[in-house]
């Protein structure tokens, strides 16, 4: 076997399959594009689903890639096992209806064993296969130097996730030798394919050849697919470990440089103490995931991807604490991650200035979060005492763990000091529920969707002419599909999919909704209503139409757009470009578009940004867009190659993929973007631009909704009506007086609130005067014990504050019946002798409650206000008992 590092192994895989006619697909963003079923890209095939389900036909049916991926559904295993990671790379080769087993297996063997490539000794390789798939077994055994007896049948070697494509798979295992054997020879798992450390799975090849139809349970009865596919996956980290003879993935060149830096920062040594090794591994794994995710545009937050990043960062910080790293340190690991991955992912080092500030901010914020977690725990302990509870609920403990990053062990220790326990059974349930939610969010990876044979096989040419004209005469009907079948004609009343040889109808794409309109005869008679237009797999525009008259293949028709809708959508699309540029100019040049929706009545624009956009900034953005509308800038476009477009300064949409030829839309000298949609001819056509709202829709992603033209005018008229109504309520003579009237109203309200507080304080003082007159004695201590009903805790505290000022006794206990609940507060002037917390604990059972606090002040709550008198009466008994100790 050759001596190869991780970069060489990755590149050799890609080079090999490129030599076999495969196109190298670049590693795509970890943030899925147009796939809401996935939280992250979680496998090599995840970015290729559009090819396998037939929604897009690839330029080359042979594809290979090295795809960065994230999976967090087993996050708790990271650091405790040899090969669990949240971030990893998958090497893969794929065939979309092209080659199959007879090519895939010999190529796999060649890559693995040929001295020109990996050069692995054949005797170290073992193969598992599906028992009924004898073809696969025979193909492996026919390879040069294949060792007899190294094929093992496995009943679970059949890939099937429900209805849709399925098929047998074959796995390649590498024998690491007796040195790594962790089970006795007679253990049922001690074989290639079992759960052991000696035989390591390094490659899985799926033969997608059957169609799992609804109602079928026996895979031997699945029918063959018309297009058979190949999907393979080789985990880079695993393969590197065998080339470097490493005990686990963490002792390879992908991880060790990070571990060495953590050693330097902590003063600890990796490999010395098992628990500390877990922390080394967690930090090393998590910083890789966080670095790549932030580089791809994800940001920490409370939901979705943002929550995952925040959780990974917090886990890394907590494990840093376990290694006695007290200061922020994670940013120092980012350049090391970038250097390790530089050969294939140069963007990490290029994006350091974007990645490091995010981690720095989040790490600093987490220190405050830890403090907040401690405060919450204090509140929970206090509440438990009030409610006479003996436990902190598992739900609350999980909130401390999940939201504040507070370890369960720390919660248990703090609770024990307060005489409480933690409901760990309920905590475990909350943890399990969250893991199930995470797995659901990841979604079942459906490698291939149903293959729509009718659409995939459609190769008829169709040209979109809508950039230059809004109607077409003598368009020919090139294809008709009814009920998923190609037909020669369709009848009135049917819903059909139509393809024309040329069309002015824009197909929904890039956030812009599709055109609508009519199919007409030469005399203007409407033959069909077009309600939607989408891109077919072979890039034709496919029109969803409700037929009013019969239509047939070859028939000549006229195509007419709904011009009111088309013009409104085009104007709003131009407005999104103006808004995009205004955001870059006013806020920051590194803002990325994160999505958009262009409708006739309004537009929606999503963009990457931390935190809300201030109102003043939104005003500047709105003013700039309206200025460019007033400037009457011409809107033009050219078609050119992608490199020329970049030289022109055209902005690409973050995460989008482009072909060799691109369309660049320019709005004067103000904005240039890659774009395939329709636009106004001049910005003056927009008339007016008005922002309706700005909001957050996820971690680090903001959304602006806006209107233009007539919609903007209507909105302003509605605002004017509301303002007039407010003026009427406030008795304002002019609309301009409304703000001053509101300020007057607020000031009046504040004055009333002050008067209420003043009266409350006076009432408390009067109550204090009365109860301070009744000082009691018990043992050697003086005390006051009184009940004042309908008081809040704050009211009771004010009485205690007044008591401290007057120093009239050694102890005070005040109780109140507030809405059927009993409240007690106690304060001690001699906390070293009479602890307020102990007094409250002693008397609170009388009100069926519990409580506690500091030696100088404590409080309790209970559900039996009828017991207040008994509780107060028992104070003397408690104080007398102190003399006897």
Curated annotation (Swiss-Prot):
One of its GO terms (molecular function) is transferase activity. It catalyses: tRNA(Ala) + L-alanine + ATP = L-alanyl-tRNA(Ala) + AMP + diphosphate. It comes from the Bacteria. It is an enzyme of class 6 (ligase). It is found in: Cytoplasm. It holds the Pfam family tRNA-synt_2c. Keywords: Aminoacyl-tRNA synthetase, ATP-binding, Cytoplasm, Ligase, Nucleotide-binding, Protein biosynthesis, RNA-binding, tRNA-binding. GO terms for cellular component: cytosol. Its EC number is 6.1.1.7. One of its GO terms (biological process) is alanyl-tRNA aminoacylation. Transmembrane segments: none annotated. Consists of three domains; the N-terminal catalytic domain, the editing domain and the C-terminal C-Ala domain. The editing domain removes incorrectly charged amino acids, while the C-Ala domain, along with tRNA(Ala), serves as a bridge to cooperatively bring together the editing and aminoacylation centers thus stimulating deacylation of misacylated tRNAs. PANTHER family: ALANINE--TRNA LIGASE, CYTOPLASMIC, ALANYL-TRNA SYNTHETASE. Catalyzes the attachment of alanine to tRNA(Ala) in a two-step reaction: alanine is first activated by ATP to form Ala-AMP and then transferred to the acceptor end of tRNA(Ala). Also edits incorrectly charged Ser-tRNA(Ala) and Gly-tRNA(Ala) via its editing domain. Belongs to the class-II aminoacyl-tRNA synthetase family. This is Alanine--tRNA ligase. It comes from Oenococcus oeni (strain ATCC BAA-331 / PSU-1). The lineage of its organism: Bacteria, Bacillati, Bacillota, Bacilli, Lactobacillales. The gene is alaS.
């Amino acid at each position: 076997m050759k001596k190869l590092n991780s970069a060489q192994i990755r590149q050799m895989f890609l080079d090999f399959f490129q030599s076999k006619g495969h196109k190298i697909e670049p590693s795509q963003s970890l943030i899925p594009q147009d796939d809401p079923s996935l939280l992250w890209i979680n496998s090599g095939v995840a970015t290729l689903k559009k090819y396998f389900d037939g929604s897009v036909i690839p330029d080359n049916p042979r594809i290979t890639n090295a795809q960065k991926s994230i999976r967090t559904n087993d996050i708790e295993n990271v650091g405790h096992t040899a090969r669990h990671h949240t971030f990893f790379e998958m090497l893969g080769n794929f065939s979309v209806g092209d080659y199959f087993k007879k090519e895939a297996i010999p190529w796999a063997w060649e890559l693995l064993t040929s001295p020109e490539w990996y050069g692995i000794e054949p005797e170290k390789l073992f193969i598992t296969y599906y028992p009924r798939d004898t073809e696969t077994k025979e193909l492996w055994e026919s390879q040069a130097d294949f060792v007899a007896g190294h094929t093992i049948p496995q009943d679970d070697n059949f890939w099937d996730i429900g209805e849709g494509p399925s098929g047998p798979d074959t796995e390649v295992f590498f024998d690491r030798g007796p040195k790594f054997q962790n089970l006795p020879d007679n253990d049922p798992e001690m074989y290639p394919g079992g759960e052991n450390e000696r035989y390591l799975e390094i490659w899985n090849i799926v033969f997608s050849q059957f169609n799992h139809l609804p109602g079928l349970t026996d895979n031997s009865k699945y029918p063959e697919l018309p297009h058979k596919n190949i999907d393979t996956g080789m985990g880079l980290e695993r393969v590197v470990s065998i080339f470097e003879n490493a005990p686990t993935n963490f002792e390879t060149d992908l991880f060790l440089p990070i571990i060495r830096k953590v050693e330097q920062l902590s003063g600890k040594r990796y490999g010395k103490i098992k628990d500390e090794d877990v922390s080394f591994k967690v930090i090393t794994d998590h910083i890789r995931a966080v670095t790549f995710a932030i580089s791809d545009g994800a940001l920490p937050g409370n939901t979705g991807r943002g929550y995952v990043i925040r959780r990974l960062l917090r886990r890394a910080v907590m494990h840093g604490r376990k290694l006695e790293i007290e200061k922020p340190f994670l940013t120092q690991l980012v350049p090391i991650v970038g250097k390790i991955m530089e050969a294939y992912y140069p963007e990490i080092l290029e994006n350091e200035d974007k990645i490091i500030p995010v981690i720095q901010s989040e790490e600093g914020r987490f220190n405050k979060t830890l403090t907040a977690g401690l405060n919450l725990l204090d509140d929970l302990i206090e509440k438990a005492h009030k409610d006479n509870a003996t436990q902190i609920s598992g739900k609350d403990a999980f909130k401390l763990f999940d939201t504040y990053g507070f370890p369960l062990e720390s919660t248990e220790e703090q609770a024990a000091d307060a005489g409480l326990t933690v409901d760990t059974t309920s905590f475990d349930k909350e943890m399990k529920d969250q893991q199930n939610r995470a797995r659901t969010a990841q979604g079942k990876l459906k490698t291939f969707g149903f293959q729509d044979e009718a659409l995939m096989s459609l190769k008829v040419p169709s040209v979109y002419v809508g950039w230059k004209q809004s109607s077409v005469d003598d368009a020919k009907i090139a294809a008709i599909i009814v009920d998923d079948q190609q037909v020669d004609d369709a009848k009135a009343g049917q819903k059909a999919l139509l393809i024309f040889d040329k069309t002015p109808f824009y197909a929904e794409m890039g956030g812009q909704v599709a055109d609508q309109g009519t199919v007409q005869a030469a005399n203007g008679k409407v033959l069909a209503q077009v309600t939607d237009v989408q891109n077919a797999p072979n890039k034709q525009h496919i029109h969803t139409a409700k037929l009013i008259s019969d239509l047939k293949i070859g028939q000549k028709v006229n195509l007419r757009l709904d011009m009111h809708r088309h013009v409104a959508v085009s104007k709003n699309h131009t407005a999104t470009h103006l808004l995009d540029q205004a955001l870059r100019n006013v806020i920051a040049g590194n803002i990325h578009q994160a999505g958009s929706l262009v409708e006739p009545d309004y537009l929606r624009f999503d963009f990457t940004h931390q935190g809300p956009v201030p109102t003043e900034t939104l005003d500047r953005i709105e003013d700039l867009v309206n200025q460019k509308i007033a400037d009457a800038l011409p809107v033009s476009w050219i078609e050119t190659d992608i490199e020329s477009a970049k030289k022109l300064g055209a902005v690409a949409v973050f995460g989008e993929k482009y072909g060799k030829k691109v369309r660049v839309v320019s709005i004067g000298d103000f904005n240039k973007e890659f774009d395939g949609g329709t636009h106004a001819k001049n910005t003056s056509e927009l008339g007016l631009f008005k922002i309706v709202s700005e909001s957050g829709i996820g971690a680090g992603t903001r959304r602006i909704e806006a209107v233009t033209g007539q919609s903007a005018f209507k909105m302003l008229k509605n605002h004017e009506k509301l303002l007039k109504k407010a003026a009427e309520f406030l008795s304002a003579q002019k609309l301009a007086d409304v703000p001053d009237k509101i300020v007057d109203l607020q000031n009046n309200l504040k004055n009333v609130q002050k008067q209420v507080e003043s009266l409350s304080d006076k009432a408390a003082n009067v109550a204090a005067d009365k109860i301070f007159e009744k000082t009691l004695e018990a043992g050697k201590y003086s005390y006051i014990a009184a009940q004042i009903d309908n008081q809040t805790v704050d009211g009771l505290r004010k009485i205690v504050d007044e008591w401290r000022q007057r120093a009239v006794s050694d102890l005070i206990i005040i109780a109140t019946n507030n809405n059927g609940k009993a409240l007690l507060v106690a304060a001690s002037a001699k906390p070293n002798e009479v602890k307020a917390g102990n007094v409250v604990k002693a008397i609170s059972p009388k009100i069926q409650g519990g409580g506690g606090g500091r030696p100088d002040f404590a409080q309790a709550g209970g559900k039996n206000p009828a017991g207040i008198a008994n509780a107060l009466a028992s104070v003397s008994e408690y104080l007398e008992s102190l003399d006897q100790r």
